[in-house]
């Protein structure tokens, strides 16, 4: 009563194979997986210090938690990631932080177009992620502003 032999034959036939995926599709997926990952840049001691200062401020915001990820510290609001600050490594530039925004308002888009430190890094493969270059303490105010915008966007 455990099932007919026909059902067993079907289960055996499907075992180990992804249903509906062609051999070419499996080869293409394997080729993508075999590609080397882009190297993450090591950050300087100054950048470690600047990011630690930013991180201290961000952790004081309501509902913010942090979690280590890929040599960076990810910041979350109510379970949604909104930023990542380098601890030992950075994505793209060694001086860059990254943040995620759902959609920029017209005012944010205008401000972003005038700020050469802001961009969508070529090493960031996901939509809505932006990078911000920090070269000195003078850049922290603007970096904090963008992190605040990302925090609000993560509602």
Regions inferred by a protein language model and the residue ranges of each:
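Well-ordered alpha/beta subsegment
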Residues: 123-155
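Short, intrinsically disordered, mixed-charge
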Residues: 56, 111-118, 145-153
């Amino acid at each position: 009563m455990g099932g007919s032999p026909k059902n067993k034959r079907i289960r055996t036939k499907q075992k180990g194979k992804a249903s509906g995926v062609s051999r070419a599709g499996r080869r293409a997926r394997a080729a993508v997986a075999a590609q080397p990952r882009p190297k993450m840049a090591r950050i300087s001691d100054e950048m470690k210090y600047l990011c630690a200062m930013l991180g201290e401020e961000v952790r004081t915001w309501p509902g913010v938690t942090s979690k280590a990820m890929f040599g960076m510290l990810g910041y979350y609001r109510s379970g949604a990631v909104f930023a990542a600050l380098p601890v030992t490594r950075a994505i793209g530039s060694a001086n860059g932080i990254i943040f995620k925004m759902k959609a920029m308002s017209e005012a944010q888009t205008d401000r972003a177009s005038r700020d050469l430190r802001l961009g969508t890094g070529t090493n960031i493969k996901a939509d809505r992620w932006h990078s911000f270059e920090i070269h000195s303490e003078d850049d922290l105010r603007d970096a904090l502003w963008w992190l605040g915008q990302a925090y609000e966007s993560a509602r």
